């Protein structure tokens, strides 16, 4: 499925909801979506409160 990236392990996508980047500052955790090998960006804290 994939070759490399933060959401890829042994040529397979990591399952949806796997943290690929820890929260820092005003950013929330970033999670794998189970469909890409890249780590999708998540919104800032408070943006959806």
From Swiss-Prot:
Transmembrane segments: none
GO molecular function: toxin activity
Cellular compartments annotated: Secreted
Keywords: Cell adhesion impairing toxin, Disulfide bond, Hemostasis impairing toxin, Platelet aggregation inhibiting toxin, Secreted, Toxin
GO cellular component: extracellular region
Gene3D superfamilies: Disintegrin domain (4.10.70.10)
Renumbered ranges of motif Cell attachment site: 24-26
Tissue and organ expression note: Expressed by the venom gland.
Xref: InterPro entries: Disintegrin_CS (IPR018358), Disintegrin_dom (IPR001762), Disintegrin_dom_sf (IPR036436)
Keyword Secreted applies: yes
Domain annotation Disintegrin: ranges: 1-47
Functional note: Inhibits ADP-induced human platelet aggregation.
Subunit record text: Monomer.
Protein name listed in UniProt: Disintegrin ocellatin
Gene source species: Echis ocellatus
Lineage: Eukaryota, Metazoa, Chordata, Craniata, Vertebrata
